[in-house]
Amino acid sequence: MTIPLLQYAPSSQNTRVAGYTVGGDEQPFVFTTDNVISDSDFDVLINAAYRQIFFHAFKCDRQQLLESQLRNGQITVRDFIRGLLLSETFIDSFYNKNSNYRFVEQCIQRVLGRDPFSEQEKIAWSIVICTKGLAAFVDQLLNTDEYMENFGYDTVPYQRRRSLASREQGEIPFNIKSPRYDAYYRSQLGFPQVVWQNAVRRFRTPDRVPQAGDPALFLNMARSAQIPKVNVRVSAADISLAAVPYRN
């Protein structure tokens, strides 16, 4: 008997607050098949899906079968997103390199377009992965009312309400906020690394090397000179009050 999804309380986030937004460069562009009228539009939509799920997809990471089915109308955008989440690239890059809690966090960010409400939500979805498996977790996440109301079958997920008109600065994009590898796996790979480990040395051509009598040689000697510091203390009893200026 599988455990049902545990209940968790939502928190106040921008995605849950209805508001009037003004279109601009900071607002996310919605990619949907409703606006596709040519093959180039399909290319843009597919690349947007790769950026949302993989952040960056190499040529070897592309799912050509899923792309062909999407172009021919055999599957919806929602099915295409499901295929990317269950692909070998996503499993190897995210599922195998993170704990269940962190993997749930990254899936919620990429699929639902928001941050997890709390640790209770991470625990609830992690139990689904442990009891039902990865495929059941992806299906249950895509079948939520939240996903269907915001993206439906034909829209590529995006980070919702990242920028608000009342705030000078928007939220950090998910691909920057949540690195692909967990801290443990980054340490196993040796990150972060110091790229330059040698001392920086100054090179001078022979014609610019200081010769005897050059003032530059005396400059180093002057810098190395130790000048004693003398702290002069003045007692208030030695000050003549008649010398203090005053107003008439």
Swiss-Prot record:
GO terms for cellular component: phycobilisome; plasma membrane-derived thylakoid membrane. GO terms for biological process: photosynthesis. It is a peripheral membrane protein. InterPro entries: PBS_linker_dom, PBS_linker_sf, Phycobilisome. Rod-core linker protein required for attachment of phycocyanin to allophycocyanin in cores of phycobilisomes. The phycobilisome is a hemidiscoidal structure that is composed of two distinct substructures: a core complex and a number of rods radiating from the core. This is Phycobilisome rod-core linker polypeptide CpcG. It comes from Picosynechococcus sp. (strain ATCC 27264 / PCC 7002 / PR-6) (Agmenellum quadruplicatum).
